[in-house]
Structures are given as structure tokens and as C-alpha cells.
Amino acid sequence: MSASAVNVTPGRNVVVVGTQWGDEGKGKIVDWLTDHAQGVVRFQGGHNAGHTLIIGGKKTILRLIPSGIMREGVACYIGNGVVLSPEALFKEIGELEEAGLSVRERLFISEATTLILPYHIAIDQAREARKGAGKIGTTGRGIGPAYEDKVGRRALRVQDLFDARTFADRLRENLDFHNFVLTQYLGGAAVDFQATLDTMLGYADRLRPMVADVSRRLYEENHAGRNLLFEGAQGTLLDIDHGTYPFVTSSNCVAGAAAAGAGVGPQKLNYILGITKAYCTRVGSGPFPSELYDADNPSRQDQIGITLANVGKEFGSVTGRPRRTGWLDAAALRRSIQINGVSGLCMTKLDVLDGLDEVKLCVGYKIDGEDADLLPRGAAEVARCEPVYETFGGWKESTVGINSWDALPANARAYLTRVQEVAGVPIDMVSTGPDRDETILLRHPFKV
């Protein structure tokens, strides 16, 4: 190694994670931060969550490829912690290339990334159908079953595609197992071996130019002085270990997963940016202490909840499912901050609260008559949480597009200040609209 290489100051690495149940607006913030990054990394999840970007008024939804792909010259990485559907990947690549973006020469996929195969999707959908009203609310895209195979040490990985004979042998073995479950337990149809083999091997040559030793590349890029941005998917409260289990996703969505899911040393993660909306949302089943619902009909949102959903366009970017809405839950936020080691917060969708007469903040709970200031760990206990609120005056002025703290309405500043106090970490960024320019910067994650 040359003396000049030794003297290069390593780049700075920032991890972006959701602190709620996903859908916090991470995509826009990752895109904004990419101005100061030379690489963006996905380290967990699959194509079950969409990151929505509004650039110059044009809407783009990315499900698998890192949001940095929207910036020419930025390298994008899919780490070993991701589960990859080649079909979804090439569909997304095609959409981006049709929009005039270069993708393949800037996208690097870990050879150790687990593949999603047709039988994973079949099992996912058959399970949900069997559960009926008790379903968790998966997207049916095979994410969970693919992670099950990974933990069960039977997963097929990207690198396996390049040895057709071994791939075929292992695929046949896997199908013997999964088809038994599909037909004998779930009552579904068997997945055809030859059709699956032909489809998957057909991706091999198309994937090969993008396959890389991602862990090594990230190490070398960082030590050459280049900044890296690690883009989390879903949110902390959906984490397989730390979320409201079993109403969770199948991967670790917390900041620590960036190290394992991309193959980087944890000491290289310099700053953790926690993304929180100015209110809360949740998709699918599971407890939600601060949910806004009609007291006379708990299965329906109340009028404020409906307003938040409509103004905030709270519909899943991948599934189109409506999101449940509620006030910001600071007790849940504190739990996420502790788990992730959050350095600073970015509050998104502040503008959605414009026009409300009052704004509430959940600062704790009553659980069976006892006070609690932190979200419990189990779903059953979370379901017994009765929210304790502080109430703030609303603001009638529009905050849309404001990009300085002092220009915010006084009541909006008071609300944000109180959130900082109860959270115990600073709010470093505030989003006041979907476009990248509609952002207030208080401390820059790459410059702290």
C-alpha cells in the first residue's frame, strides 16, 4: 500500500433508519443526503417496501434498488442482508432505464444475496390465505419464506446461479420440501421444477456483470475517502427482534443490521439518522397505541385520522393499502432511539399537520393502571397500552416548502422543541414537503 493511500482520511458513513412502522419518508431523505455520498447501500429487506421520491415534481417509487440511483455518478449496492427477486430487480431496472438513467454500470449486488424463488411467493400467499382474519398482512412477495430458507441453511444465493448443475440439484431438493408443504399442508398447487430452473438460470448472464464482493468494495471505497449512505427499509417497530412481534417483517430493520447486512465493521457507522413522521402510521395488523379511531366504531378512523391519511397520501407505495394513522408516539420513538443509537432525528411530513386546531403527542402509557414511558416489547402488552397525551396548539399557516427554522409558525416550533425534549436527541432535519428542496437542515449528518 502506498504512503498516499495510508494518509487518506476515511469517508464518513451515515445510516438512515425508520423509527416507526415504516413509511416514514426515508427515500426522500436518502436522496437529499446523496449530495454528500458517493455510494448508497441497501442492507436488508426486499421489494416489499417502496421508497417514494419526488424530484422536480416527478414521482418515482424504488422497491429494491437504492435511492441513490437517481443521482448520476453515485454507486449503489445491494448487500448480503437483502433477499433478491431477479424478476422485480429487472423490472425496476427497465423502468429506470426507460426514464433515461444509467443503472447497470452503477449497481453492485453481493454474491451472497439470497434469492427469492417462485415457491417462496407461493408459500407466502398460501399461508396468508389459510390464516384468514388472523393474517399478519404480508405483501405476499416471498420475503419471509426466503429469509426462512436463509436461516434454515437451504437458501439459494446469487452466486449459486453460476453453477447450473449444482443449482439444479439444490433446487430439486428445495422443491421436494416446499412442494410437500404447499400441497399437503397449505392446500396449494405444486411449483414446477423445470419451469423454475429455466426461469432462474435465465437470469444468470444478466446478473453476472453486476455481481461483486460488496463487502470488500465498501471497505475500499471508505478507505479511499468516499462517503457511504446506508439505506434502511421498513422501520424499527417492524424489526423481527425488536418490533411488535409477531406483527413484524422478516428482517432486522435497525441500524446495527447495516454492519451484518452489508459486511462492514460496526465502528465504521459514524452517524445514525432516525426518520420519524410528525404523526404515526401503520399498515396491516398489529397493535398501535396512538391510533386515531372512531370511539363508536373502533374499526374505522376518526375524522382527524382520515384527514391525516388524505392530506399525507397515506397509501402503501407498493401495495396501495391504506395506512392506519395516529398521533406521534414519543414513548415508541424513545424505544427506537435506544435500540438504534440514533444520533439525530429527521421529522418528515410536518406540513400534514397544517390547519389542525390542536396537535397531540403521546408521551407515555397506562398499562393495567401502571405508568410506562417506553413502548413494551411484546404485542400483547403493547395492545394494552392506553396513551397519555400532551396537547399543543395547532397552526393555520402553511409550512409547505419552508426551509428555515425561524420561518416556521411558532406553534410548530413549540411542537418540534417538545419532541426533541422527550426524545432525548436533537431534530437535525425537518421535511416540509415531498420535494428534496422542501427541507430544513439544522445539523448535517455528514458534517457533524
Swiss-Prot record:
Keywords: Cytoplasm, GTP-binding, Ligase, Magnesium, Metal-binding, Nucleotide-binding, Purine biosynthesis. It catalyses: IMP + L-aspartate + GTP = N(6)-(1,2-dicarboxyethyl)-AMP + GDP + phosphate + 2 H(+). Pathway: Purine metabolism; AMP biosynthesis via de novo pathway; AMP from IMP: step 1/2. GO terms for molecular function: adenylosuccinate synthase activity; GTP binding; magnesium ion binding. The active site is at D23, H51. Gene3D superfamilies: Adenylosuccinate Synthetase, subunit A, domain 1, Adenylosuccinate Synthetase, subunit A, domain 2, Adenylosuccinate Synthetase, subunit A, domain 3. Binds 1 Mg(2+) ion per subunit. Its cofactor is Mg(2+). IMP binds at D23, E24, G25, K26, N48, A49, G50, H51, T139, R153, Q234, T249, R321. One of its GO terms (biological process) is IMP metabolic process. Its main location: cytoplasm. Mg(2+) binds at D23, G50. GTP binds at residues 22-28, 50-52, 323, 349-351, 431-433. The keyword Cytoplasm applies. PROSITE patterns: ADENYLOSUCCIN_SYN_1, ADENYLOSUCCIN_SYN_2. InterPro entries: Adenylosuccin_syn_GTP-bd, Adenylosuccin_syn_Lys_AS, Adenylosuccinate_synth_dom1, Adenylosuccinate_synth_dom2, Adenylosuccinate_synth_dom3, Adenylosuccinate_synthetase, P-loop_NTPase. Substrate binds at S317, V318, T319, G320, R321, P322, R323. It is found in: Cytoplasm. It is an enzyme of class 6 (ligase). Belongs to the adenylosuccinate synthetase family. Plays an important role in the de novo pathway of purine nucleotide biosynthesis. Catalyzes the first committed step in the biosynthesis of AMP from IMP. PANTHER family: ADENYLOSUCCINATE SYNTHETASE (PTHR11846:SF0). Homodimer. This is Adenylosuccinate synthetase. The lineage of its organism: Bacteria, Pseudomonadati, Pseudomonadota, Betaproteobacteria, Burkholderiales. The gene is purA.
